[in-house]
């Protein structure tokens, strides 16, 4: 039994937990005030959307892009329509003429140019996003028409402009010295909520924007409340101090499967899950020259040591489906099957022997040239499911004669390691439905992505060039075939081991309607939600 379950049982026995019989005063007050208060393990951070210090779920309430990516493709948002030149290098956007920033400043072509130029001033920071390297210039054609010129054709351009950041819009009056790369004075966007009171590491209020250009929010306020994951978040939801939780963009799941079930069983809450949004994976660092993971045969062996079916069923409680390939088939251009290695310990053992790592008579750990087969794995300590998976894999690796040292760190530290290459193995995830496949594939060769992980591939330059070429292809079938070829080579290298197809989980009051999802695991349409 989990620690949380034991804690809950003791509190229930002592009568300290409120029961779900309609007597939860905290929930009733929030409904009356048309308010949601969600639990989060981290402060919302810096709400400047042109850098990466803030919570994307919070930023998406404040800021908006030119276009929206939906299950039916790219749709208008701040741009009511657009034209693309025959050579695919010029995008002309025709803007809405009824939009204002939260500070009253009109949203127009000049504001669009200033914002995109501001993002481009810091383009090294955005190199993981291919379009940032291709924007040549932005021209104002008239008050509500703007022209975006690329250095070369790039088919995913609109999809990348539709992302929650960085190509979203801040009031030019908030710029510092005419730009945003060194911060902004305030956080005025065009979205359905305005940032209200923000108490660092405690809470942040997002108040309804009564002057919003689109359909106004049915909620008066959404509040983010900072607290530890686990018992604290669970009890807060039980008492009605908070009444909403979701798998956030920092990789954390504040509530584990036991607490989700208990909250639902009270009758006060509903639990909803999205379609597959991304792929949870194990990244094996081919560039770690001082470790056995630099050996392709060892990486392939590790691929046969991951029992994704057992992980999905027993650790993830069936909430996520086993991932047999890096991208699910609901991802754009991924209309093919490419099964990765199956769980097979005998095959793993054979590959380790082939790589020269032998089991000795006096040790359970394999050795080669007098050196033990030892690896370090990193997981997000804010994710209880990652911790459980790490512990499970530690036991599996031990069976194979590998000493696996597991380390829990913050999501920020994990991201730093991904960039620096200071890891043997780590848990990570694909960029997500809104971004993929282009963003994760582009990240295979980017410093801020997985360049360190792929740097040990013998023919990496050839693969990197294939990636650049694929992004120029306008024909859908040809582009899909190009992606398939790239992914086949990457899978053969054993660097990205898919585990499960992750979805977004929401816990909401039972009487909250229109709880839905977008194409992104990084945002929720709070403005559409309403109480019965």
Swiss-Prot record:
Effect of residue 522 to A: Does not bind StP/metal
NCBIfam families for the chain: nickel_nikA, opine_bind_CntA
Residues passing through the membrane, by range: none
Inducing stimuli: Repressed by zinc.
Gene3D superfamilies the record matches: Dipeptide-binding Protein, Domain 3, Periplasmic binding protein-like II
GO molecular function: heme binding; nickel cation binding; peptide transmembrane transporter activity
Name of the protein: Metal-staphylopine-binding protein CntA
Any Gene Ontology CC annotation: outer membrane-bounded periplasmic space
Membrane topology per record: Lipid-anchor
Effect caused by changing residue 165 to A: Does not bind StP/metal. Significantly reduces metal accumulation
Subcellular location: Cell membrane
Signal peptide residue numbers: 1-20
Any single Pfam family the record assigns to this protein: SBP_bac_5
Organism from which the protein derives: Staphylococcus aureus (strain NCTC 8325 / PS 47)
Summary of activators and inhibitors of this protein: Nickel/cobalt import is reduced in the presence of zinc.
Lipidation (S-diacylglycerol cysteine): 21
Disruption phenotype: Deletion of the cntABCDF genes decreases nickel and cobalt intracellular levels and decreases virulence. Insertion mutant shows attenuated growth in several infection models.
Consequence when changing residue 128 to A: Strong decrease in StP/metal binding
């Amino acid at each position: 039994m989990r620690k949380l379950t034991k804690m809950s049982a003791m509190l229930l026995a002592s009568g300290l937990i409120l029961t779900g019989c309609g007597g939860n005063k905290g929930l009733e007050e929030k409904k009356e005030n048309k308010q949601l208060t969600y639990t989060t393990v981290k402060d919302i951070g810096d709400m400047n959307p042109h850098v990466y210090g803030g919570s994307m779920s919070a930023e998406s309430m404040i800021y908006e892009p030119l276009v929206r990516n939906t299950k039916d493709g790219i749709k208008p948002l701040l741009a009511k329509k657009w034209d693309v030149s025959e050579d695919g290098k010029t995008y002309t956007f025709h803007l809405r003429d009824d939009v204002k920033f939260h500070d009253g400043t009109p949203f127009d072509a000049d504001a669009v140019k200033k914002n995109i130029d501001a993002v481009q001033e810091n383009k090294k920071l955005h190199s993981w996003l291919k379009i940032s390297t291709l924007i040549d210039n932005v021209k104002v054609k008239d008050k509500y028409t703007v022209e975006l010129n690329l250095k070369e054709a790039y088919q995913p351009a609109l999809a990348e402009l539709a992302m929650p950041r960085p190509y979203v819009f801040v009031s030019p009056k908030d710029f510092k010295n005419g730009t945003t790369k060194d911060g902004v004075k305030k956080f005025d966007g065009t979205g359905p909520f305005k940032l209200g009171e923000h108490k660092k590491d405690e809470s942040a209020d997002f108040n309804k924007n009564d002057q919003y250009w689109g359909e106004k929010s049915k909620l008066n306020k959404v509040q983010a409340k900072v607290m530890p994951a686990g018992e604290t978040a669970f009890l807060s939801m039980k008492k009605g101090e908070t009444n909403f939780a979701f798998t956030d963009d920092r990789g954390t799941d504040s509530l584990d499967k036991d607490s989700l079930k208990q909250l639902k069983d009270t009758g006060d809450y509903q639990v909803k899950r999205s379609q597959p949004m991304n792929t949870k994976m194990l990244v094996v660092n081919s560039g770690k020259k001082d470790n056995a993971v630099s050996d392709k045969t060892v990486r392939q062996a590790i691929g046969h040591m991951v029992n994704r079916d057992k992980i999905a069923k027993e650790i993830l409680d069936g909430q996520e489906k086993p991932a047999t390939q890096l991208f699910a088939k609901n991802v754009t251009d991924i209309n093919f099957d490419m099964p990765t290695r199956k769980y097979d310990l005998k095959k793993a053992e054979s590959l380790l022997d082939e790589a020269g790592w032998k089991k000795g008579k006096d040790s359970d750990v394999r050795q080669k040239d007098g050196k033990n087969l030892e690896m370090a794995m990193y997981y997000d300590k804010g994710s209880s499911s990652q911790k459980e998976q790490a512990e499970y894999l530690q036991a599996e690796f031990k069976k194979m004669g590998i000493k696996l040292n597991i380390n829990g760190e913050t999501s920020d530290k994990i991201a730093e390691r991904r960039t620096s290459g200071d890891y043997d193995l780590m848990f990570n995830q694909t960029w997500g439905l809104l971004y993929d496949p282009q963003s994760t594939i582009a990240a295979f060769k980017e410093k801020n992505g997985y360049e360190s992980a792929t740097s040990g591939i013998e023919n990496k330059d050839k693969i990197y060039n294939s990636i650049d070429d694929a992004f120029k292809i306008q024909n859908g079938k040809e582009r899909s075939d190009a992606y398939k070829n790239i992914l086949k080579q990457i899978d053969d290298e054993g660097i990205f081991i898919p585990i499960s197809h992750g979805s977004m989980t929401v816990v909401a009051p039972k009487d909250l309607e229109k709880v839905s999802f977008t194409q992104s695991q990084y945002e929720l349409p709070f403005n559409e939600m309403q109480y019965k």
